[in-house]
Regions:
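Short, leucine-enriched amphipathic alpha-helices that occur as contiguous helical runs
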Residues: 195-197, 298, 302, 330-334
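C-terminal catalytic core of tyrosine-transesterase DNA break-rejoin enzymes
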Residues: 2, 201, 331-354
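Conserved tyrosine-mediated DNA breakage-rejoining catalytic core shared by Y-recombinases
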Residues: 215-271
Length: 379
């Protein structure tokens, strides 16, 4: 592997295993039982009518329809729904009841159990409980049933939980420009360091979700699981993303310094990793001298952020445990919205927010106490 001429940065093997941040490949793989259960449910929900005789053509169409049905929700959503159903069915077995057909009375008791502190079981937040309910409703629909969330046995219990346990939403700490500069400075000058530098800088400048970062391909339609692709221009890079709110374009301009320019970091990573097709961000060999074929998991982004936050002493005034809890993959996205001193319309477009109110939520944190109405009123 050659050496970089720009910035006198040398590519060298660190010998550090990929496990330091991203763990083993098995950690990134979905639980096989949950995956099999999801496939079974989706397969059962798409089938020929009982009165129609099967044929080769129709059977192939059924398989095609099942594939589209599986792709109707994001992979992370599918995993969450499968885990929700697994947890609920285990709870039903423990209580001596059957999850099918849906019983609003039992679902109401389940929701109450989730909100109550019993033994070592942690109390779930209201948002997590609501997400569990969505998962149950989806699973019942796939099995040909309907869960009426407005039934009084569910709705009144949930309303009481909200009234008694609701708390303001906990937002992850935003990573600011000076933070990201300190974080990338902690990375080694080997192939893995080039990759992680590009991940942090591109994620910050693009205001991207961690799943969007790792789903990027070099070109359009390189892989079936692609979430977007990259085009390079003189002025920067254009990312086309299949995001949570639909397709959107993200413009990442070139920075004022190669040390912190996201486009330069991305170009360096692709050049020295010799990646010209398929996933942009992949695993590295243990000696950090070769780029492998397998796409990184979005978990790597969260681990990378936490690791570099600690190494760079970001918010070093706080205990380590609190710093780890404060920062996550979302901190990159929040950082751009909180830092950019531009019209909110441009920030909203970059982040792909469906409403300006979501963008303003970040900017209100940025602008907190900027205008002192107390002093302005003469007090």
């Amino acid at each position: 592997m050659g050496s970089l001429t720009n910035n006198s940065t040398k590519i060298e093997g660190s010998g550090a295993p990929e496990d330091e941040i991203s763990r083993s490949a098995s950690d990134d793989a979905p639980n096989s039982d949950e995956h099999d259960e999801r496939k079974r449910v989706e397969g059962a929900s798409i089938a020929l009518p009982a009165h129609v005789a099967g044929s080769g053509t129709l059977d192939r169409l059924v398989d095609t329809a099942r594939g589209y049905a599986e792709a109707s929700t994001a992979e992370n959503t599918n995993k969450a729904y499968a885990a929700d159903w697994k947890h609920f069915t285990r709870w039903c077995r423990q209580k001596g009841t059957d999850p099918l057909p849906p019983s609003p009375e039992m679902v109401g008791l389940y929701v109450a159990d989730l909100a109550a502190a019993t033994g070592k079981t942690p109390v779930l937040s209201v948002s997590t409980i609501e997400r569990r309910l969505s998962g149950l409703a989806w699973n019942y629909t796939q099995r040909g049933f309907t869960l009426d969330r407005k039934d009084r046995h569910i709705a009144t219990v949930l309303a009481g939980i909200k009234r008694k346990h609701a708390r303001p939403p906990v937002q992850k700490e935003a990573i600011l420009p000076e933070d990201i500069q300190a974080m990338v400075a902690t990375l080694p000058h080997d192939l893995r360091g080039l990759r992680d530098r590009a991940i942090l800088l591109v994620g910050f400048a693009g205001g991207m979700r961690r799943s969007e970062i790792v789903s990027l391909d070099v070109h359009k339609d390189d892989t079936p699981d692609s979430g977007g692709w990259i085009e390079f221009f003189e002025g920067g890079a254009l990312l086309t993303l299949n995001a949570k709110t639909g397709w959107r374009e993200v413009e990442i301009g070139r920075g004022s310094s190669d040390q912190t320019c996201p486009v330069h970091a991305l170009e360096q990573w692709l050049h020295f990793s010799r990646i010209d097709f398929g996933p942009v961000f992949v695993r590295c060999s243990r000696d950090a001298k070769r780029a492998l074929e397998s796409r990184l998991s979005d978990k790597h982004v969260a681990r990378l952020i936490k690791a570099t936050v600690l190494k760079s002493n970001v918010r070093s005034d706080l205990p380590e445990a609190k710093r780890l809890a404060m920062f996550s993959g979302h901190s990159l996205r929040a950082g751009l919205a909180s830092s950019a001193e531009v019209d909110e319309r441009y920030v909203q477009k970059q982040l792909g927010h469906a409403s300006a109110e979501m963008t303003r939520r970040y900017q209100r944190r940025r602008d907190r106490f900027r205008v002192n109405l107390t002093k302005a009123a003469g007090l």
